[in-house]
Every structure is written in structure tokens, then in C-alpha cells.
Amino acid sequence: KNFGLYRERTGAMTLISENEAAAKVATTQIAAAARAMYSMPPDHGAAIVQLILSNDALRTEWDTELTEMRDRINGLRAQFVKQIQSIGIDQDFSFIEREKGMFSFLGVDVDQVQALVNDHSVYLVNSSRINVAGINDANIEYLANSLATVLKV
């Protein structure tokens, strides 16, 4: 996903097993599952990744962009937690700042999620997973205030 190739079916699977025999059995089962989905996996995404990683200039550009995005998301996490704390939410949401990646779970229940969606137009899934990358200066205060409102109900 770091390459933004969501529809290209790129990826890797790592298998850890107790011994070589178990690894062979698991590999056979994984291959059978892959064949059931498609007999010839697409190569376009993998070819793009290979091109980027094998070219020093492209790899440097990709790494720079990835670092910028990671720093942006980490900054958003910190800003969101600071905003939550500044409005006086009693619960500890500092875990959001310590997490990694584009998504975070708010740890609210399904009724609170539905209140965020229906009453505040804050969109997240029932598990309370939000896309941190979707937070910005224009909506961070609204998001924190909406969260505070549903937590008080």
C-alpha cells in the first residue's frame, strides 16, 4: 500500500513455521488458495514496485514522499490528541499519538460511532476506525468537539 497501488494486487506474504515440512504444507495450501482466486496473478503493480526500488532516483523520491506522509500523519495524530486534551475530554486518547499508520481506532462503542456518523457527519466504521490522513486543520476541532459530544451522552 505504500506505493498507492491498491487495485494492482501487489504484496508479499511472510510465513513462519516450526520446520521445513510444515512450511512446505503451508506453501502448498497458500498456492492452492491463490490459484482458486486467479491462475495467473497480475504483474503490473509488482513491475512498478520493482522499477521504483531498483532505480536510485525513483527510490529516493519515493522514500522522500513516504517520509513526508509519515511525518504529516504523525503530526496529525499529535494535533488531534492535543485538541482532545484542550477541550477537556476525560478519557486518555494518548494512544492515538503512539500508534503508527493511516488509521486509528477511537475505542468508542457502536452507538457512539453511529452518533458521530448520524449526528455529526463524521464518517468511520463501526469498529471506530478512522482515517487519520483525512484529518486536517479545517476539521480537527470539529472532530474533537464531535467526539466530546458523543462521549458525554
Positions of predicted regions on the chain:
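A structural signal for short secondary-structure junctions
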Residues: 42-43, 95-98, 124
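Active-site-proximal structural scaffolding
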Residues: 4-8, 42, 73, 109
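Structural signature of PLP-dependent enzymes
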Residues: 27-46, 51-81
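PLP-dependent enzyme catalytic core of the Aspartate aminotransferase-like
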Residues: 82-86, 108-153
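Short, well-ordered loop/turn and helix-capping segments at boundaries between secondary-structure elements
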Residues: 16-17, 54-58, 86, 149, ...
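Active-site PLP attachment segment
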Residues: 1-25
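Conserved PLP-binding catalytic core of the aspartate aminotransferase-like
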Residues: 61-119
